Amino acid sequence: EFRPNSDGDKGPNSDGDKGPNSDGDKGPNSDGDKGPNSDGDKGPNSDGDKGPNSDGDKGPNSDGDKGPNSDGDTEF
């Protein structure tokens, strides 16, 4: 029930606004302020709390509740 390819809004292949392939403002290829190379606080290389390598709660490798590998509740 935490499918990484969910059609929700937080999976990596999601058509939502937070996936890496998303056209939203949080994907790694986004021109927004939350991509992995961004100096913001949500990219995977960021020191923030939402990147996949972060200790936060939204990255795919996070122990939080929104990443595709998470034990959370958003990928369904």
UniProtKB/Swiss-Prot annotation:
Organism, scientific name: Plasmodium falciparum (isolate Palo Alto / Uganda)
Protein name: S-antigen protein
Entry's localization field: Parasitophorous vacuole
UniProt key word Chloroplast: no
Compositionally biased region (Basic and acidic residues): 1-68
Superkingdom of origin organism: Eukaryota
Keywords: Malaria, Repeat
Region feature (Disordered): 1-76
Role of this protein: S antigens are soluble heat-stable proteins present in the sera of some infected individuals.
GO cellular component: a single term: symbiont-containing vacuole
